[in-house]
């Protein structure tokens, strides 16, 4: 198995909190990513949305697009509606030869609201779980057929947050639904990344390796 090492532009600027690195240019981000030795970078808010503009920019700094975030509303949308919503990003990523789309369900998410407690995040009852898994399986098959697999990102403040959520998703979806294992989000949710890796390694397609300040979690 070969592993390629990339980086996310959130290390330079935060799309959710523009005041963090908002003044940092895309060129500085790409230049420093290359200088640090990375061969790939995920997409971000400052990245061009047209491949005719993005590919030359990446080539300028000897970088490849290694994935990028897509926030879905599959709990509310039909699969066909979600296909239409993701199409522009799908086409861009195919043009850039990215390996996957980092996919997360964000309907009802509290991740962007610092005044909300994590305990108020959205959660699904049994019937909705079944429908959600059926829909994401259908979408996963579609994206796999398009050559751009779905790598699901468990994320704090969203409907798939905990280790239990993540296991339930993987165990009840088609094998085309892959996983982005995020060590920071898993630890924040009091989960065990090592367990996920050992037991679901065949579904892991993308990994986010993150540090986390435990002292802040326990405040």
Protein language model features and the residues they cover:
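Conserved, mostly hydrophobic/aromatic
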Residues: 7, 33, 41, 58, ...
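Active-site acidic/histidine proton-transfer and metal-coordination neighborhood
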Residues: 79-181, 188
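Non-cysteine beta-strand/loop elements that form the S-adenosyl-L-methionine
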Residues: 4-8, 66, 100-106, 202-213
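Acidic-and-aromatic substrate-binding clefts and catalytic sites of carbohydrate-active enzymes
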Residues: 40-53, 72-84, 156-162, 183-191
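Conserved small/polar residues in nucleotide/adenosyl-binding loops
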Residues: 217-219
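Active-site mouth loops of central-metabolism enzymes
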Residues: 11-24, 74-82, 121-128
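Acidic (Asp/Glu)-rich catalytic clusters
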Residues: 2, 31-35, 49-67, 88-98, ...
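Short, acidic/polar
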Residues: 18-32, 82-92, 189-197
């Amino acid at each position: 198995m070969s592993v390629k090492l990339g980086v996310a532009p959130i290390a330079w600027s935060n799309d959710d909190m523009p005041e963090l690195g908002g003044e940092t240019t895309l060129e500085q981000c790409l230049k420093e990513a290359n200088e640090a030795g990375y061969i790939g970078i995920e997409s971000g808010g400052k990245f061009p949305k047209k491949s005719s503009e993005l590919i030359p920019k990446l080539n300028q700094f000897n970088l490849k697009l290694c994935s990028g975030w897509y926030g879905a509303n599959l709990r509310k949308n039909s699969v066909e509606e979600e296909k239409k919503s993701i199409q522009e990003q799908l086409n861009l990523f195919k043009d850039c030869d990215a390996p996957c789309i980092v996919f997360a369900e964000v309907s009802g998410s509290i991740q962007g609201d610092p005044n909300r407690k994590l305990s108020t995040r959205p959660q699904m009852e049994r019937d909705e779980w079944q429908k959600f898994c059926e829909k994401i399986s259908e979408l996963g098959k579609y994206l796999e057929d398009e050559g751009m697999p779905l790598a699901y990102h468990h994320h704090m403040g969203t409907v798939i947050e905990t280790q239990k959520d993540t296991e339930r998703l993987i165990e009840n979806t088609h094998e085309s639904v892959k996983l982005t294992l995020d060590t920071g989000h898993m630890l924040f949710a009091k989960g065990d990344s090592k367990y996920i890796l050992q037991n679901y390694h065949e579904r892991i397609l993308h990994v986010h390796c993150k540090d986390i300040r435990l002292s802040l979690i326990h405040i």
